[in-house]
A protein has these predicted regions:
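Active-site core segments that coordinate phosphate-bearing ligands/cofactors
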Residues: 6-7, 111-123, 137-149, 153, ...
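Small/polar loops that bind or transfer phosphate-bearing groups
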Residues: 9, 95, 99, 131, ...
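Short beta-strand-loop/turn "lid" adjacent to the catalytic site in phosphate-handling enzymes
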Residues: 42, 62, 66-98, 123-130, ...
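N-terminal glycine/serine-rich phosphate-binding loop of ATP-dependent small-molecule kinases
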Residues: 1-94, 219-228, 405, 411-413
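Short alpha-helix plus adjacent loop in nuclease-associated cores
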Residues: 100-113
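Glycine-rich beta-strand-to-loop/alpha-helix junction loops that act as flexible
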Residues: 77-81, 207-208, 255-258, 390-398
Length: 440
């Protein structure tokens, strides 16, 4: 009998349920459900609707069982750094999104207790104002941690709601900025220094672990029973597993709402040069994902929403423009502006001529992203003291031929675009490995 597996891959802008199976040695997949995901602005803060998210998770499982009654297992991956605090096993609302500005006020205080250079040496995680370490400290200052009894990252929370088993998965935990790069566990010295309750940060679990089965009430609701397992719950970790590279250690670019450019390494690099370059050492499946976070398609997504046109139409508009001025896509001003187009125009006007048309603005975004990829690639080669001729691109951005061509131009490398659901494939690959009795 054909063995089917369900990957639930949720990004910051959408979620998808993808069923996968092996057919004559080839992985086949079918998307059975897709739903939008977006940030909610409430009382001046940016939040996730975690209840709607879980409802969509269940609806997608229901759709999967309707078409594929025999599903061997399922797993969930999502974006990193965000989490749910629990009291009496109930969420403490709101569930903030990483784009909320509440961390800005506490970052100096955290660094006065633990200078960033010291944090980086221990964790190897790059500075981002939204890292969980700053979010949790903001929660402590606001009194939210005092009432909390538990802490689960978003995918851990959703998996727990399905099977009733709480687990803290390694790859996603590393994104918090609280995991020691050498021990691969939450760092008690960091927790103690910041006054974070150690009981909420227990031993980590490796991807490829079976958590259990759907709880009876959930199974009845979705119309089927299956095993629930841990994949690499950080979507980028699953994406790297899903990229079919001829060279196992070739650089990759996971191109989605965020763009992550890096390479697999056996050991972390936590020296001062790496710290200054703001590269990160995130957990992978048996390796370190040494990479740089770049703003990514978020800027393009915001512009697309404002213009109300398709991504394909944006590409065609860009082709008509000779305007190629570059701006810093990683600047904090582009994280959650009220008006992305106005913010881009203002940034470009500060250093020269502003874009005259939307075509100019779009073309500038594409060139700026590709330029940033080129800079990050050169930093990667310098920091690792290695040289490569290829860059593998997966994710939504791999479908954008114009952006791929510009990336090849600015990196000076051969670009291998893989317009596949790399994250879902990595998620499925880990599940299949468990089913076959192997190790991940």
């Amino acid at each position: 009998m054909q063995k089917n597996y369900l990957a639930i891959d949720i990004g910051a802008s959408s979620g998808r349920h993808i069923v996968g199976w092996m057919e004559n040695g080839v992985l086949r997949t079918e998307e059975v459900y897709r739903f939008p995901n977006s940030v909610q602005r409430v009382d001046g803060h940016l939040e996730w609707d975690i209840d709607s998210l879980f409802a969509n998770v269940k609806q997608g499982i229901r759709e999967a069982f309707a078409k594929y009654p025999n599903i061997e297992s399922l797993s969930i991956d999502t974006w990193a750094v965000d989490y749910v605090l629990l009291k009496n096993d109930q969420p403490i609302y709101p569930v903030y999104t990483y784009r909320d500005s509440r961390t800005q006020a506490v970052i100096p205080e955290v660094h006065s207790i633990l200078p960033f250079e010291q944090l980086y040496q221990r964790t190897g995680i790059q500075f981002q104002p939204f890292n969980s370490i700053y979010q949790l400290y903001a929660d402590k200052k606001a009194g939210r941690l005092a009432e909390a009894e538990d802490f689960l990252m978003i995918p851990e929370y959703l998996l727990w709601k399905l099977c009733g088993v709480k687990a803290r998965e390694y790859t996603n935990a590393t994104s918090t900025g609280l995991v020691n790069a050498q021990t691969k566990e939450y760092d008690p010295e960091i927790l103690k220094a910041l006054g974070l309750p150690e009981a909420m940060f227990p031993k980590l679990t490796a991807p490829g672990t079976v958590l259990g089965s759907l709880m009876p009430n959930i199974a009845a609701e979705v119309g089927g029973q299956t095993k629930v397992v841990l994949c690499a719950t950080h979507d980028t970790a699953s994406a790297v597993e899903g990229i079919p590279m001829e060279q196992g250690d070739a650089p990759f670019l996971s191109s989605g709402t965020w763009s992550l450019l890096g390479v697999k390494l056996a050991k972390p690099i936590t020296n001062p040069e790496s710290c200054r370059a703001n590269f990160t050492n995130e957990g992978g499946v048996g390796y370190i994902r040494y990479l740089k976070n770049i703003m990514g398609l978020w800027i393009i997504q915001c512009v697309q929403k404002q213009l109300g046109i398709s991504f394909a139409e944006m590409v065609e508009l860009a082709k008509t423009s000779p305007y190629t001025r570059i701006f810093d896509v990683n600047a904090a001003r582009f994280s959650a502006p009220q008006d992305m187009r106005a913010e881009i125009r203002a940034a470009l006007a500060e250093t020269g001529e502003a874009p005259a048309t939307d075509a100019d603005l779009i073309n500038s975004v594409y060139h700026s992203l590709a330029y940033c990829y080129g800079e990050a690639f050169r930093e990667l080669e310098s920091l690792t003291e290695q040289h490569w001729d290829k860059l593998y691109i997966a994710g939504g951005g791999a479908k954008n031929a114009t952006l791929n061509e510009l990336t090849a131009h600015y990196t000076g490398k051969q670009v291998v675009a893989l317009p596949i659901e790399a994250t879902a494939i990595g998620n499925l690959k880990i599940q299949m490995s468990i089913s076959e009795g192997g190790t991940v």
